[in-house]
């Protein structure tokens, strides 16, 4: 099986359409379909900050849950939106406010439909996907080699948030260790979460979050070809979001 793994979309629907078309997908049915049956895989954070978060929920739900032709691994923004939909006490900030504003503008029956679709998508998706006979792993923020196969709380925190130190940058964002430099496995780990200006290959890992929502690019990785394909963002460039990994 061949896969096209898509970086953090964050509600950037137009960029997602442009990227999938560049990857050879046809949208005539209203969904991206590849003539050679390649499958899409998402590294999470499909919502927040960008203009079309709810439409991205509908598309990914349709592909992953209804048609079962794609893979989705939730990100930290997905986790927070899930908790919001469950009625938990979450801070509506750091991008969630844009998704909530879209949601609250809907009539109640459409709100219920979106909520049910996202809860189903989140609950029926694993923390990470191990594909191609363990040669490929798709997740949100990365995973240590000794965590593969585990689903416990420590692994969940790592997969959703990365290798956080507990310290904070001046803007309040967490300081993260560069776990990829220590990775010695042969399974390719494809992930996102931390915006980089260009796809970052380190050992058998690839970070494909090229900051579409911050004016960078939306990137896909063609597997097993290991080729990256990108399209430019239509949004303003925010240079401070592309911080070097410490």
From Swiss-Prot:
Annotated GO MF terms: bis(5'-nucleosyl)-tetraphosphatase (asymmetrical) activity; GTP binding; nickel cation binding; phosphatase activity
Pfam family, any one: Metallophos
Enzyme Commission identifier(s): 3.6.1.17
Catalytic activity: P(1),P(4)-bis(5'-guanosyl) tetraphosphate + H2O = GMP + GTP + 2 H(+)
Top EC class for this record: hydrolase
Cofactor(s) listed in the protein's UniProt record: Ni(2+)
InterPro entries, alphabetized: Ap4A_hydrolase, Bis(5'-nucleosyl)-tetraP_PrpE, Calcineurin-like_PHP_ApaH, Metallo-depent_PP-like, MPP_PrpE-like
GO CC list: cytoplasm
Keyword field: GTP-binding, Hydrolase, Nickel, Nucleotide-binding
Record-stated family: Belongs to the PrpE family.
Matches recorded under PANTHER family: BIS(5'-NUCLEOSYL)-TETRAPHOSPHATASE PRPE [ASYMMETRICAL], METALLOPHOSPHOESTERASE
Role, per record: Asymmetrically hydrolyzes Ap4p to yield AMP and ATP.
This protein's name: Bis(5'-nucleosyl)-tetraphosphatase PrpE [asymmetrical]
UniProt lineage: Bacteria, Bacillati, Bacillota, Bacilli, Bacillales
Gene assigned in the entry: prpE
């Amino acid at each position: 099986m061949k896969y096209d793994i898509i970086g953090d979309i964050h509600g950037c629907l137009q960029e997602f359409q442009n990227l999938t078309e560049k990857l050879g997908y046809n949208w005539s049915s209203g969904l991206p379909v590849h003539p050679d049956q390649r499958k899409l895989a998402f590294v999470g954070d499909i919502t927040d900050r960008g203009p079309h978060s709810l439409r991205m929920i509908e598309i990914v739900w349709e592909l992953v849950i209804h048609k079962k032709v794609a893979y989705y691994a939730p990100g930290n923004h997905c986790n927070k939106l899930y908790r919001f939909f469950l009625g938990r006490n979450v801070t509506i900030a750091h991008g969630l406010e844009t998704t909530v504003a879209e949601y609250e503008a809907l009539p109640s029956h459409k709100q219920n439909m979106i909520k049910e679709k996202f809860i189903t998508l989140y609950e029926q998706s694993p923390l990470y996907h191990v594909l191609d006979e363990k040669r490929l792993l798709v997740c949100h923020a990365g995973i240590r080699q000794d965590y593969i196969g585990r689903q416990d709380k420590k692994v969940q925190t790592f997969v959703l948030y990365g290798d956080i130190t507990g310290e904070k940058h001046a803007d309040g964002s967490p300081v993260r260790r560069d776990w990829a430099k220590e990775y010695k496995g042969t399974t390719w780990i494809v992930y996102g979460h931390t915006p980089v200006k260009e796809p970052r290959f380190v050992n058998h890992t690839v970070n494909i979050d090229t900051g579409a929502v911050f004016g960078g690019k939306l990137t896909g990785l063609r597997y097993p070809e290991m080729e990256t394909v990108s399209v430019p963002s239509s949004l303003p460039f925010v240079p401070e979001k592309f911080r070097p990994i410490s």
